[in-house]
Regions:
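Conserved catalytic submotifs in the C-terminal HATPase_c
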Residues: 1-4, 43
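Short alpha-helical Gxxx[C/S/T] motif in the catalytic ATP-binding
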Residues: 80-84
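Short conserved segment of the HATPase_c
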Residues: 57-67
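Short beta-strand/loop element within the Bergerat-fold HATPase_c
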Residues: 33-44
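Conserved micro-motifs of the catalytic ATP-binding
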Residues: 5-8, 70
Length: 123
């Protein structure tokens, strides 16, 4: 198979993925079932989905607003998703969230595929 090629700053993309995974792990702390799925699908765009079995998302409308948090004071200031959304937007993509069909949350990063595949991939 061919590698999935996107134009992105590797460190900034890693920051977003780490933030989504940490949020998913935090969301599942009180769950009896703890499953975290990271799925990559490719079509016209590259789509990376982070899916958890936590309680789901109550306030989808304000989720990406700066300083919005569901965490206890001292556990987070509510900037992670706002920053992550900004990073993905800067890369020409979008970050979205929804509740999973069977519960939990699903976050999707959609990024355009690199058209010129003659470029070397970052390690």
């Amino acid at each position: 198979e061919r590698p999935v090629m996107i134009m992105a700053d590797r460190l900034r993309l890693e920051q977003v993925i780490i933030n989504l995974v940490r949020n998913a792990l935090d969301a599942m702390k009180g769950s009896d079932t703890r499953e975290l799925d990271i799925l990559l699908t490719v079509g016209d765009s590259a789509v990376l989905a982070v899916r958890d079995t936590g309680a789901g998302i109550e306030n989808l409308e304000t989720l990406f607003e700066p300083f919005y948090t569901t965490k206890k004071p001292g556990d987070g200031v509510g900037l992670g998703l706002a920053i992550s959304s900004g990073i993905i937007t800067d890369l020409g993509g979008r970050l979205s969230a929804r509740n999973g069909v069977d519960g939990g949350a699903v976050f999707e990063i959609v990024l355009p595929m690199l058209e010129n595949r003659d470029v070397e991939a970052a390690e």
